[in-house]
Amino acid sequence: ATYILDTSKMLTRELKLELEKIFVKGQNFCNLYITVMSFGFKYGIPSDSDLVFDVRFLPNPYYIDGLREKTGNDPEVQDYVMGNEKAEQFLEKLKDMTEFLIPNYILEGKNQLVISIGCTGGKHRSVTLANALYKVLEKQENYGVRIEHRDIEKDTITKRK
């Protein structure tokens, strides 16, 4: 066998990351793979989070009729969220923190980092800020990065029932 993986104690997410490291070609990074995850606090904090940030201090687009059914993937919601000075300040502070932490995690030998950003439902504010952080991190070449919006569809599914 070319590769041997002991999956007996792996979470599904960990197995996926290990397989991506082996089979995703053209990746040139130092064994650190970062997941930027948005989530809704009402569904619980992701158990595999290393860093958790709460953006519920920002105005909630849910209460704006034209934005309620949209998500942080939509430009209108992104403009609303990032149009708030506090959102820009938060992103700058988050960029500063990750610029400090990531090289230190690499030196420590950490191979997986989950940065979770949460709001109430995981649909608007957290998605917007997670996307913004992902765009910053994907510009670097010494680690891999992916985005996941864990709860983006949960309210929609619940309301259909």
Where is each model-derived feature located?
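A short glycine-rich beta-strand->turn/loop micro-motif centered on a GG-aromatic cluster
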Residues: 144-152
